[in-house]
């Protein structure tokens, strides 16, 4: 008993023990329960226990083998995660994509990989862990990729300690200042969402006006005055949400302010002609001079004003009037300014401080307006950084190894992360497309681009858009791509005068040949749809399809769990999240075949409610309604049914599709009845007129893996999803292979009796 009391009193001061023993004692020598040390400790221990139970443990998680991922901080508490499995599920939603952890998070390792975590109790406050799937632990210096500023509250006991521990107390002002090294004087344009023409204001951000993300949001609310009240969200013109203060100081300088209301990309993020003119008038010379005013020591109330005050003083006009006077001065930051200190870092990002988004939305006006002060400013920037302006208007130098072999022409496509230029091989006069990916736009996600390019390197097939050549430099990645000029699949159908089952059969023959080749390499495309099927016109007048856009493609070495793709063409096993493989491409091809023969998809939702569509896909009930299918052969319907089987094992493989009579011409009807599907395709799909026949091919090339992040969607699982998914009957007479490992065909794959 005495030993227990000594243990209990360890946390008390030794000099108070004697007083506590003698004070309030009774005749029997026992201390009074009211004043005893035991009673005091009992109350303290209870409060500490309750506090520790409620307190969240802050830990950092990395992705196994991902040397570019800086980790994500999680607050682990019993209220948030009731079980270890719940934590794994949440980590899967956060960390899994089509490249990293495609099978989901199934294992958590300690940072050294020596131990596997199996319960929440094993997670230690402030430590770091590595999330993996079924692959072995990959030993990397994960903590070397982490910015030490990932927590303001870190207190290290020694400089050599690899992993910092987190403290619960808030850091002091000095720590906060250290974490604002990214702040530099910058003038941003804020456009309010809503009916056009929209109000816009310019706000100066610097270390005096940008104290925190919440404070900047408050200042923007005061300046922009949304009809719906408080500004809840900010987006770049690319649709990326601004999540923290540092996002204001990236490459973007135009932001859309939104309240709690819903928004549509085509309505809110696309600027009309008047808004382009207004944005273009935002001279970067003005920004530079405003930056100098923000950094120099000058008396007056402007140094103490908040962002809205800075807005009016900097602009000199009301917020809705964005035109500024032209100035011939070019920005030249002082040797001690943040701009000069970061000159080397800016050059690694691609150089000019001009926003890619603002350049993109005003490109059509720039072609007609002639050279202006902004062009002269960009030319000075390019000369300062050693770029050859005459070779590239976007501000990057094309490597000599490419210009020696190819004549690079005008820009024909502009995506979120890539630019596409005309490219003609000098020796053969053959026309290609030069895809230029700016690495500054992909910072932190380079692995996604690398995955796409690595797959393009491996594939070489007459029904696949080819990668001809690549060149990797520190600031850009150059890809010489095959340019397909015949439009996409929908263009071919809607523009033809006569369209029959034989044409549809030839199209499926081309598509199945490409899928067969990919599956023989264990590559799954995951985004097969008409927009990614381009029409190639041969010299003899015949046509064939080429499959492009490998942004979601990946190697299959086990079940995949990432829910991604285009909803109309997504397979049921993807939605059910039970694990999927190569045959999701066959399902998509089956949906396309159905559309080719009637003009509308087999599974249709109601409005924007994707759950209705997903439920139909999970059921897998394929109907052939009259009169749309009255003139279609039974052989075609049979093939579609076999391609759209919910049971993956019974679903056709690519080899079986190619061997089917309807595809190899044996099952085609003798009387070629013309199919009237063009009007239905125009009604059910967005197939508006394109500016040129090459627009579809350029659009496919301009797309990158980073654009596909929007196609990774999440669906709340219903309790009966798996039961419905597994309950579908399968024809017992078929015993097809579960995967397609057939060798690839080396000859040009074209249906012998069809233009395709």
Curated annotation (Swiss-Prot):
Pfam families: DCX, Pkinase
Keyword Endoplasmic reticulum: no
EC number: 2.7.11.1
A GO CC annotation given for this chain: postsynaptic density
Protein kinase domain sequence ranges: 406-663
Modified residues (Phosphothreonine): 46
Biased composition (Low complexity): 297-313, 347-364
Catalytic machinery residues: 527
Catalytic activity: L-seryl-[protein] + ATP = O-phospho-L-seryl-[protein] + ADP + H(+); L-threonyl-[protein] + ATP = O-phospho-L-threonyl-[protein] + ADP + H(+)
Biased composition (Acidic residues): 366-375
Binding site for ATP: 412-420, 435
UniProt domain Doublecortin: residue ranges: 57-143, 186-269
MF-aspect GO terms: ATP binding; protein kinase activity; protein serine kinase activity; protein serine/threonine kinase activity
Modified residues (Phosphotyrosine): 536
GO BP annotations listed: axon extension; axonogenesis; brain development; central nervous system projection neuron axonogenesis; dendrite morphogenesis; forebrain development; intracellular signal transduction; negative regulation of protein localization to nucleus
Span list, region Disordered: 288-393, 711-756
Keywords: ATP-binding, Developmental protein, Differentiation, Kinase, Neurogenesis, Nucleotide-binding, Phosphoprotein, Repeat, Serine/threonine-protein kinase, Transferase
Keyword Transferase attached: yes
Phosphoserine modification, residue list: 32, 36, 305, 307, 330, 332, 334, 337, 347, 352-353, 355, 364, 392, 742, 751, 754
Known function: Probable kinase that may be involved in a calcium-signaling pathway controlling neuronal migration in the developing brain. May also participate in functions of the mature nervous system.
PANTHER family: SERINE/THREONINE-PROTEIN KINASE (PTHR24347)
Stated family: Belongs to the protein kinase superfamily. CAMK Ser/Thr protein kinase family. CaMK subfamily.
Name by which UniProt lists this protein: Serine/threonine-protein kinase DCLK1
Organism expressing this protein natively: Mus musculus
